[in-house]
A protein has these predicted regions:
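Glycine/Thr-rich phosphate-binding loops of Rossmann-like dinucleotide-binding domains
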Residues: 49-50, 71-73
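Adenosine-nucleotide cofactor-binding segment
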Residues: 1-51
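Conserved functional loop/turn residues at catalytic and ligand-binding sites
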Residues: 11, 31, 43, 83, ...
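Short, charged/polar "capping" segments at the starts of alpha-helices
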Residues: 1-5, 73, 148
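Helix-to-beta-strand junctions that scaffold the AdoMet/dcAdoMet cofactor pocket
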Residues: 56-58
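C-terminal hydrophobic helical "lid"/dimerization subdomain
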Residues: 50-54, 95-148
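Acidic carboxylate diad motif detector
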Residues: 65-66
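Rossmann-fold dehydrogenase core element
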Residues: 61, 74-114
Length: 148
């Protein structure tokens, strides 16, 4: 609920708590007749990924950003026949992301509302506790005083 509320405050048109509503019902309510073009799996929830795969448009793209359990089942038949593109985070693509983000920030993108917690790097455990709690947006670890 915390992150859904944060998304609403940041301008999300619709947020969905899958424990309370079915994605297909929400799609119908907002007038969607096809699936999603882009999906971003950030929760690390296997059932959420499965639901996303089943509700993507042909040729849709899914970014896998959450850490899923090792035994997560992926319906490869749906992925193959719907031409879905699943992409994780790896190597040089991360650097490309940094360059794009830098450009977006320089052009005026305000990321401040997404950053909900800041900790000195020496308090990294508190940062991880905030992330794990589900009651945070982005957590920033400040390395400024690492050698003090």
């Amino acid at each position: 609920p915390y992150r859904l509320d944060l998304a609403k405050k940041l301008g999300a048109t619709e947020t969905v708590n899958l424990k309370e509503r079915k994605l297909t019902d929400v799609m119908r309510e907002v007038g969607m007749t096809e699936g999603f073009d882009v999906g971003m799996e950030m929760s690390g929830n296997a059932a959420g990924l499965s639901d996303m795969i089943n509700n993507m448009k042909h040729g849709g793209k899914i970014a896998l950003l959450g850490l899923l359990p090792k035994d997560t089942h992926v319906d490869m038949e749906t992925v193959i026949f719907n031409g879905l593109n699943l992409r994780g985070i790896y190597g040089r693509k991360v650097w490309d992301t940094w360059y794009k983000m830098t450009t977006m920030i320089q052009s005026g993108l305000d990321i401040a509302p997404v950053i909900t917690h800041r900790f000195d790097i020496r308090d990294y455990e508190k940062g991880f506790e905030a992330m794990i709690s589900g009651q945070s947006g982005k957590v920033v670890l400040d390395w400024t005083h690492i050698n003090d």
